[in-house]
């Protein structure tokens, strides 16, 4: 619901959060179940302490990588398992750009290759200027579909003279497409199937921009002109249980999600 998304975005200012000291991490027991439970607790703590990876140091990124790789996936063939179906909220993204939860940016990465990092940094700067930023990032996964919903806070101020933002509004960028099962742990999305919709949650802030509300851009058609429309982006699921999902993009980027109810 829009009101819920507002609260999530507003509760996520762009500032560092103290990271738990090494000695405060949970120590696992000798049983596999105990180890995985403790590992998941440590993943949650590190994800929160680095604001979804946005403020993580190289040491923290390496620790998260080690924690993720130490988990034993309890779900065989997670790409076709019913547990995958549902709504998932991003907790951590290993490159520091939470908006990469959206398959639109998977496609950008595939198209731009080594130049993609420059694009990600530019987009991050653009969304964070004047106190804006990316709020909650959700993935809604259904049978043969995946929808990404990222809340964005946009602000406008006068930084040369230190004014607070003149206004701040919230909206969502929703990208959806069709999926197919590549193998037991991987799903693919054809670039041509992608579409992106802009939703302006705070329509009263900038009434002049209300015409953008609900606008859908057929990004798949644009990408189809740039590259082979049959090309697809892929997401591999390396861990899945009732509450936690860990996925990996084609460039090795790790994404950690928790299940949420809407």
Model-derived regions: residue spans:
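N-terminal chloroplast transit peptides
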Residues: 1-30
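Soluble ligand-binding/transfer domains with enclosed cavities or grooves
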Residues: 19-262
């Amino acid at each position: 619901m829009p009101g819920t998304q507002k609260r999530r975005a507003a509760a996520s200012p762009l500032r560092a959060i103290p990271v738990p000291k090494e000695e405060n991490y949970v120590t696992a027991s000798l049983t596999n179940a105990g180890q995985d439970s403790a590992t998941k607790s440590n993943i949650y703590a590190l994800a929160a302490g680095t604001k979804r990876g946005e403020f993580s140091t190289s040491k923290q990124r390496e620790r998260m990588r080690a924690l993720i790789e130490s988990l034993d996936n309890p779900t065989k063939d997670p790409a076709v398992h019913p547990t995958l179906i549902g709504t998932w909220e991003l907790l951590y993204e290993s490159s520091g750009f939470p908006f990469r939860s959206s398959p639109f940016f998977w496609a950008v990465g595939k198209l731009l290759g080594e130049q993609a990092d420059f694009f990600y940094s530019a987009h991050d700067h653009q969304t964070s200027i004047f106190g804006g930023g990316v709020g909650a990032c959700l993935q809604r996964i259904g049978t043969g579909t995946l929808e990404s919903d990222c809340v964005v806070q946009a602000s406008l101020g006068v930084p040369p003279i230190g004014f607070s933002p003149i206004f701040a509004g919230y909206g969502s960028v929703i990208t959806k497409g069709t999926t197919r099962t590549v193998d037991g742990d991987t799903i693919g999305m054809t670039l041509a199937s992608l579409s992106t919709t802009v939703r302006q949650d705070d329509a009263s802030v900038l009434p002049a921009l209300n015409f953008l509300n609900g606008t859908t851009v057929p990004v798949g058609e644009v990408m189809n002109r740039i590259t082979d429309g049959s090309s697809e982006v892929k997401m591999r699921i390396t861990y899945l249980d009732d509450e936690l999902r860990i996925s990996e993009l084609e460039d090795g980027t790790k994404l950690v999600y928790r299940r949420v109810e809407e």
